[in-house]
Amino acid sequence: MKHIPVLEDGPWKTVCVKELNGLKKLKRKGKEPVRRANGYKTFRLDLEAPELGATVSTTAATNGLRDRTQPFPIATPVPASVAPAVPPGGGTDTAREFRGIRAPEVSDARKRGFALGTVGPGLPTPPPPPASQSLAPGDPEAHSFREQALRPRILLCAPPARPTQSAPLAPPAAPQESPVRPAPPTRPGESSYSSISHVIYNNHPDSSASPRKRPGEATAASTEIKALQQTRRLLANARERTRVHTISAAFEALRKQVPCYSYGQKLSKLAILRIACNYILSLARLADLDYSADHSNLSFSECVQRCTRTLQAEGRAKKRKE
């Protein structure tokens, strides 16, 4: 077991100051430097002190936070009878008292949102009411005047409004109907993306009015169209088949009425028509009638020969085809 060194046995190891990058001396914060707002000095304000310096500092702080476009108001001179008498050596004590006692109140006001960066260029600050010369510093009316002077600080914490347009307003023109509905007015703290999305949504028509259909609807419609086309095609084929069968039956009935070599002989529709024409002319000649196109007044024997030549030519044509 190791021997535990005792204080008297040897010197203790010292800590090197260089390794710790030097000992830093803790400094207490002194008085804060005077801050400037828009080129004017701002001082801490005593909310309860009735001195004239409080009123002047309130006016300076309020005027410093105003819009730069507004002219700086001229300070109203206060007569000597109203201003309190300040001892020659009391100015320094009063300033120290302001720093020591009123610093928590000022820091609390900063925490509540009183900062120079929150003031927007488009948010004017109402000017404080002018100080009345007839009011004494210790009166309750003077205390209410100081409260009214502090109201602009509370108003400055409101959210910034929209930036105003620098161009002059044009005279009102005649109302014109626009296809796009106007966007609803947005609140000061609302993002501008809502108005943009509203305009984009209004520019595009509804999905129900669009000619495009959903994939399921398109498939169902195409199936119905194909079924309808197939039904129409089947009906047309049936009508054509019925027509051909009717014509074939009529020619077959006519063929049975004209002379031929045998009833089992196959004749074309054209041959049946020619034989039928010559047969009708032959019957007309028997009745002393002339049905010929050129009125050639053919004899009965000539009509019979035409029928015979037509039958022989049709028979030879059938044999060549076979």
From Swiss-Prot:
GO MF terms held by the record: DNA-binding transcription factor activity; DNA-binding transcription factor binding; E-box binding; protein dimerization activity; transcription factor binding
Domain (bHLH): residue spans on this chain: 231-283
Phenotype seen when the gene is deleted: Mice heterozygous survive to adulthood and present no phenotype. The homozygous knockout of Atoh8 is embryonic lethal.
SMART domains per the UniProt record, alphabetical: HLH
Predominant cellular place of this UniProt entry's protein: nucleus
Positions of region (Disordered): 77-96, 101-144, 159-221
Biased composition (Basic and acidic residues): 101-111
Annotated domain remarks: The bHLH domain mediates transcriptional repression by inhibiting TCF3 transcriptional activity through heterodimerization.
Complexes and interactors: Efficient DNA binding requires dimerization with another bHLH protein. Interacts with NEUROG3 and NEUROD1. Interacts with ZFPM2; mediates indirect interaction with GATA4. Forms a heterodimer with TCF3; repress transcription of TCF3 and TCF3/NEUROG3 dimer-induced transactivation of E box-dependent promoters.
InterPro entries: ATOH8_bHLH (IPR032660), bHLH_dom (IPR011598), bHLH_transcription_factors (IPR050359), HLH_DNA-bd_sf (IPR036638)
Keyword list, A-Z: Cytoplasm, Developmental protein, Differentiation, DNA-binding, Neurogenesis, Nucleus, Transcription, Transcription regulation
Protein name: Transcription factor Atoh8
Region of interest (Helix-loop-helix motif), residue spans: 245-283
Subcellular location: Nucleus; Nucleus speckle; Cytoplasm
Tissue expression pattern: Expressed by subsets of mature neurons. Expressed in kidney (podocytes). Expression is restricted to the atria, lung mesenchyme, and vascular smooth muscle.
Domain of life: Eukaryota
A Gene Ontology biological process term: negative regulation of endothelial cell proliferation
Induction of synthesis: Specifically activated by bHLH factors.
